Amino acid sequence: MSSWFNVGILCLLRFKNVQDNKIIFEAIFEVFLHFLKIPVYMTHLGFPITPTVCLIEMLGLLLLLLIPALFTLIWIYKYIEPHSLISIPGIFVFLGLYVPFVVTLLIPIDVTWDVSLSIWRFLYWLTFVLSWIILPFVQGYMESKFSTPRSRLSDSFYKNLRYYLLLTFLTCVVIAYLRFALRTMSFSNFKELVISLTYFWGLLFVIFLLGNGFVYVPVSMWKKAFITKRAALLERQAVGVYSKLQARLESYSLPSSSISLNNGRNQSSSDFFTSSLTDHAFNPHSSPNGMSNVIALQTTWNQMVKEYNRIMLIKTAKASGSYRLYLPDSYIPIHPVVAYAFYVWILPAFRILFSIFMASMSVIIVVSEVFLHTQYSLVGIILQKFTNSSATSIFVSFLFVYYMRYCTYKSLMRTQFAPHYYYALVPFRATNTASLIYFASQLCRLTLPLCYNFVSLQPYPTQFHQFYGESIDLLPLGNLISKRYPTFILLPIIFSMISLKYRLRQFIYSITLRKSSSASSSDDFDDSSLNSENDDDLFNETSAAYLAEGRALLLGTNNAHV
């Protein structure tokens, strides 16, 4: 009531001696700004507080809210059919993707200017409620096998109740340890403990995903610039994707004898897919994600075949020396000479330059992580060079934080954890609703720790650090984690550079082959036939036999389509 009373008194004082419309206009704007408490950022640039400046300010804030909403809708339309999102889950999915985008845009502004603490409090608790309560509940509802809404609500409630009880037990263990063992915890700062625990949980995955993305994103862009490497990558992935598609179809009791890795060369997988569905009844609710799992793999396979076909056309055009490239499946008709120049010269050169730029960004951020909270942080040194230009400082900060966000999310999409086998984001609107809800909840959990990690790389005080960082640093455990753990980013980088996962897989395959060889020799079989190069090469994803198998699958499907 007091705020409304103050606004009313301000109106009376303003309108008491009103003489013209200009004073009325200024009074309305001052009352509006007083009520909303909107910080006028243009005053930092030397502009006086006038109605015109306030109008420009509000239009800028409106654009700041509408641009992320537009990109969020485009992103959702890229991965899922809009009609598949029913009203209430669709709203929460939109919020789960929209709020991290807004936070990413506000961080560069907060580095240069000041964003209100009330905004950060609202955004933090909104992401907290979305990621830990609402989105898991909606996801459980969408994945429930029951048919009625009431039974699905009950099923989702009991599933999440077990999860929350486990989290509560772990939280109580941490509180007891801090309170009685270290004597650094009091119940007066329970809110700070919750913020620290959620921050550590998010940072634990952010550093791993960020380090993996710093290697994967530039390397993948570099490989795309060379058609030979891109073709080899598709050939190497073809057998795995085709095998997963076969396994999914077999798990849904579709005829498994109609498809195999050898006979599949003479039949299109899409033709098999269509004929299987027309000849046999299929219940979409027979599995947690229903038919969408098969559709996602089928879409991935079709896009691989389409891209491999384009690579073959580019190779043929380069070998012919005609400087003409004909693309019959192109959405936009392009002149053959223009298509040749774009796909052979312009696009590869752009990808090479862009991969070098992203590799440089990765090196700068990794060095800054190693020298965190020191004067040797390269991100802080670069931002200090642009202190005289606020717009340039915001732009450079946005480049760094968006690149970190892109590497983290890209690594999250490709990380082969157990849940991600069912929660996969597939473009061309082949993603199921449960996968989109799952990734929206993960983005909400990872965005704030990621943004705070970026804020720690630069020396300027921010309102985000005042709310989020001081709550973390209030506890010795949170302070230790925020200052020491980011240096472990070198571990996932080293693992990605040496392809540790591939080497471990090859080691396991070699042990399996050795055991099978010894078992066969004890049964008086011929050792040479079991240790032949063909058997060995079937497990080697870089061998000529493995690549030839993938090439045959891709070309066989392509010829079937033709």
Curated annotation (Swiss-Prot):
**Where does it reside?**
Golgi apparatus membrane
What superkingdom does the record give? Eukaryota
| Pfam families with a match to the protein in the record | LMBR1
- List the InterPro entries hit by this protein, alphabetically: GPCR-associated_LMBR1 (IPR051584), LMBR1-like_membr_prot (IPR006876)
Q: Which residues lie on this side of the membrane: Cytoplasmic?
A: 44-55, 109-121, 186-198, 351, 402-479
GO CC aspect terms:
cytoplasm; Golgi apparatus; Golgi membrane; membrane; plasma membrane
Q: Which UniProt keywords apply?
A: Golgi apparatus, Membrane, Transmembrane, Transmembrane helix
Residue spans, topological domain Lumenal: 1-22, 77-87, 143-164, 220-329, 373-380, 501-562
Entry's transmembrane regions = 23-43, 56-76, 88-108, 122-142, 165-185, 199-219, 330-350, 352-372, 381-401, 480-500
Keyword presence, Lipid biosynthesis: no
Which residues lie in coiled coils? none
The name of this protein is LIMR family protein C622.11
